[in-house]
């Protein structure tokens, strides 16, 4: 009967929606999932722009400069793959079409010490959200070539040294074991973070562009945890990236 047929289709029961009073966001958005990184970015932004509109939508914030060559919004925090994709889904219904996932990452490579800027080419998924958006368990999620090239050109123009690299997306930072680190090092993985693979999968599912940009905040490559969240190398590099966001996001909108 009709009820049984409806029950077995892949059509969702719940859809992301725009609620009365929700704002419209520009087509380009920087999504900063990590709370400490979002708040640092918002503080930098408020110090740079003459006027910044800050408001809460659902469980995350939107921080939008009133004047920019390319209108854009800073969004976050939304830590972890499920929360980041919930935020991404909401941003899409509010108008986002190009989304840069920005934040800290741990380094698995000696050539990417604290403060290094990493432009991901692929994300190897070890989280659960991407599977629900059609990602295959054994296939990395790839950043689109034009987005990658645009970001790299904008970083070079801003004088920010950077390197390409593959990243590992995990749901469980406390399960970043020595064995796993060695296995991913052997695969040429440069960094580890918590959201990019899921956001790439959801972006592909919804037909929007998603790219990533990370600053190394801590090191795991020696199989010990070296924290650098307050290290001047990380703080300065993250500030430079935030200051360059208008150009970086403009490269995605081009």
Task: Give the predicted meaning of each segment.
Residues 97-98, 190, 209:
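Short acidic/polar active-site loop segments enriched in Thr and Asp
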Residues 222-254:
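His/Asp/Glu-rich mid-to-C-terminal helical/loop segments that flank catalytic regions of hydrolases
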Residues 137-187:
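Active-site rim beta-loop-alpha module in soluble metabolic enzymes
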Residues 150-158, 202, 244-252:
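Generic non-transmembrane alpha-helical segments
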Residues 197-233:
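Zn-dependent metallopeptidase/amidohydrolase metal-coordination segment
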Residues 1-150:
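Metabolite-binding pocket within alpha/beta catalytic cores that recognizes anionic/polar moieties
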Residues 49-54, 159-165, 252-254:
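Flexible, glycine/charged-enriched surface loops at secondary-structure junctions
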